[in-house]
């Protein structure tokens, strides 16, 4: 009985460790072309204020904890679930914040591939990437704020899956 339990436990541990994807900088090289395509489209959509192109780069619904508080908010959660319709109505504006526009225009590919940070998304059990920008500078009165976008490969294309903040 003890042997059977140990065997089952060993198989479960082995299965769990071998099923985890490796998410590190080597993934950046493998995904380089797709990330470049994403960034080129993203940069162009922001430059031209094209919300249709931006919506094509998002997987709906996606969570956003700093999205615009307006009449589209329907509950008291600390984040908003951004649907296609709420995006089209007003939430697309998060992509036209001057600090984001400035940061996006600073980078070009392939030399700036490092702006994407790989991580293992424990919710989706997939490798994802984050990129960020400083939304509010730190000063003596407040700690500052950084906005992040998480992207993930979905059906052979990268899509924005969430937007969040750190302070």
Positions of predicted regions on the chain:
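A solvent-exposed, acidic/Ser-Thr-rich amphipathic alpha-helical stretch
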Residues: 69-98
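Sequence contexts marking disulfide-bonded cysteines in secreted/extracellular proteins
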Residues: 22-26, 66-68, 126-128
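N-terminal signal peptide c-region/cleavage motif recognized by signal peptidases
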Residues: 14-16
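Short, solvent-exposed secondary-structure junction/capping segments
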Residues: 58-71
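Short, low-complexity N-terminal intrinsically disordered segments enriched in polar/charged residues
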Residues: 20-48, 56
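Positively charged n-region of N-terminal signal peptides that target proteins for export
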Residues: 1-6, 19-20
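Exposed beta-sheet edge and beta->alpha loop/turn motif
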Residues: 93-167
């Amino acid at each position: 009985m003890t042997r059977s339990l140990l065997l089952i436990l060993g198989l479960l541990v082995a299965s769990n460790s071998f099923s985890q994807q490796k998410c590190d900088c080597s993934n950046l090289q493998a995904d380089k072309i797709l990330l470049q395509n994403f960034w080129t489209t993203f940069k162009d959509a922001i430059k031209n204020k094209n919300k249709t192109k931006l919506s094509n780069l998002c997987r709906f619904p996606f969570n956003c904890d700093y999205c615009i508080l307006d009449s589209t908010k329907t509950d008291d959660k600390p984040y908003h679930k951004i649907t296609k319709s709420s995006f089209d109505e007003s939430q697309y504006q998060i992509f036209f914040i001057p600090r984001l526009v400035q940061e996006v225009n600073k980078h070009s590919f392939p030399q700036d591939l490092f702006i994407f940070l790989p991580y293992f998304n424990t919710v989706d059990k997939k490798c994802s990437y984050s990129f960020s920008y400083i939304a509010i500078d730190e000063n003596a009165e407040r700690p500052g704020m950084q906005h992040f976008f998480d992207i993930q490969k979905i059906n052979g294309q990268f899509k924005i899956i969430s937007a969040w903040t750190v302070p």
